[in-house]
């Protein structure tokens, strides 16, 4: 099989992957795996300013289910919105009460996992980044809102991203786009910002012609093509770009910068790179949420305690319907290594959506692990005129 509509392939990356991933030739060459890879080399100048060179392998707009990777743009949009509102006493640590004004909505007034005992945008984002919490994503999406999300994404240049679903499964179809009243309260329980029940005003079209993937069982031996046009849409290229902008926002020209404060950026980076065991609020049981819980790159399916303190993976992952996605900024402070890497692979041999029978551990995660190490090994050997100063990132994890 040949790839269709996949024009973006770098000869250099093609050669590197085929030379280093000889055990995964099928995943690289067979279109049924829908493999995409985006790798960014980073070269610093004498003032530590970065320059980027992107290499792509089979990068396309073809539909892939982004799963939990949408938590990155949802979190980013929430922080941008808070800063734009610029209301007194309103910030990510302000108590956020979610009300209920529609049949599938839930009133949320407490959060035992937060330091204050109350829900906050900050604690929800921590839970998304640390353990990929779907309920936290739903609450933050409700604050952001369908219309604001797509208007702001369009302003930022991400015209194709679609955030239609909240991931918690509570509100089906278009009802997911109807967001409940949200109240922010100060320490005296006075309302500092109130957002009413909000209906979406525009039904957005899906940006690609076909979003059908696999088949859906509808009866005994009866299947239909699975249409994802009502689901979230986020290409690996756009995801990679968002991660790059967050990591390097302070280094970008003014016209390319995200409208995000550096303090909010550093907050995002800290929890993208943190292990669950390092978090105090929220706190996680180490046996359940092990170090490599959401670190597909470098660690694959291993249930590992990470001892390589010099390496940090700032990342977001997705896993559903046979799709595996990881998007990361990977650094090694000891060896002065840094690079950006995003990849998706589809490991659903029967091509049946919702079967629960996927080759994550047998094929997908080992591939992502090997892929990331092949890039790491290449970066370790690659000569650079100036070594990067990565102190800004290492200091995020100092006590």
Where are these regions (language model features)?
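Intrinsically disordered, low-complexity regions enriched in small/polar residues
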Residues: 5, 35, 41, 185-186, ...
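Mid-domain, small-residue-enriched loop/turn segments at the edges of structured enzyme/sensor domains
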Residues: 117, 131-257, 263-264
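Glycine-rich loops and low-complexity Gly/Arg-rich segments
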Residues: 61-66, 81-82, 122-123, 155, ...
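Short low-complexity stretches enriched in small and charged residues
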Residues: 50-55, 92-96, 107, 193-200, ...
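Structured C-terminal helix/loop/strand segments within mature extracytoplasmic catalytic/sensor domains
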Residues: 6-25, 29, 217, 221-399
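Generic detector of contiguous secondary-structure segments
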Residues: 54-67, 71, 192-194, 318-331
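Generic structural hydrophobic/aromatic packing signal, biased to beta-strands
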Residues: 37-39, 96-98, 153, 163, ...
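Active-site-adjacent loops and short helices of periplasmic peptidoglycan-processing enzymes
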Residues: 3-178
């Amino acid at each position: 099989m040949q790839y269709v509509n996949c024009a973006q392939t770098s000869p250099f990356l093609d050669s590197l992957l085929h030379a280093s991933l000889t055990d995964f030739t099928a995943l690289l060459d067979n279109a049924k795996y829908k493999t995409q890879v985006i790798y960014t080399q980073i070269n610093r100048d004498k003032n530590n300013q970065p320059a980027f060179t992107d290499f792509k392998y089979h990068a396309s707009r073809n539909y892939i289910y982004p799963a939990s990777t949408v938590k990155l743009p949802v979190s980013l949009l929430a922080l941008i919105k808070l800063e734009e509102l610029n209301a007194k006493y309103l910030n990510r640590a302000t108590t956020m009460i979610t009300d209920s004004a529609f049949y599938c909505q839930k009133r949320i007034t407490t959060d035992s996992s937060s330091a204050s005992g109350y829900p906050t945008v900050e604690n929800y984002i921590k839970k998304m980044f640390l353990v990929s919490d779907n309920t936290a994503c739903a609450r933050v999406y409700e604050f952001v809102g369908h219309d604001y999300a797509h208007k702001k994404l369009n302003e930022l240049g991400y015209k194709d991203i679609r955030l239609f679903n909240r991931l918690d499964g509570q509100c089906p179809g278009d009802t997911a786009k109807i967001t409940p009243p949200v109240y922010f309260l100060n320490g005296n329980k006075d309302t500092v910002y109130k957002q009413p029940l909000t209906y979406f005003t525009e039904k957005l079209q899906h940006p690609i012609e076909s979003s059908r993937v696999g088949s859906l069982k509808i009866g005994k031996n009866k299947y239909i093509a699975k249409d994802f046009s009502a689901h979230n849409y986020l290409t690996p290229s756009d995801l990679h770009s968002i991660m790059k902008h967050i990591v390097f926002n302070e280094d970008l020209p003014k016209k390319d910068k995200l409208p995000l404060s550096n303090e909010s950026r550093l907050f995002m980076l800290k929890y993208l790179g943190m292990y669950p065991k390092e978090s105090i609020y929220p706190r996680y049981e180490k046996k359940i949420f092990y170090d490599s819980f959401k670190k597909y790159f470098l660690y694959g399916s291993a249930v590992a305690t990470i001892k390589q303190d010099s390496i940090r993976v700032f990342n977001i992952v997705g896993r559903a319907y046979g799709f595996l996605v990881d998007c990361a900024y990977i650094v090694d402070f000891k060896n002065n290594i840094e690079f950006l890497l995003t990849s998706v692979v589809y490991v659903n041999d029967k091509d049946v959506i919702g079967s629960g029978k996927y080759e994550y551990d047998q094929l997908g995660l080992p591939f992502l692990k090997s892929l990331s190490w092949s890039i790491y090994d290449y970066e370790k050997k690659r000569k650079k005129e100036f070594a990067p100063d990565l102190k800004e990132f290492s200091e995020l994890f100092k006590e």
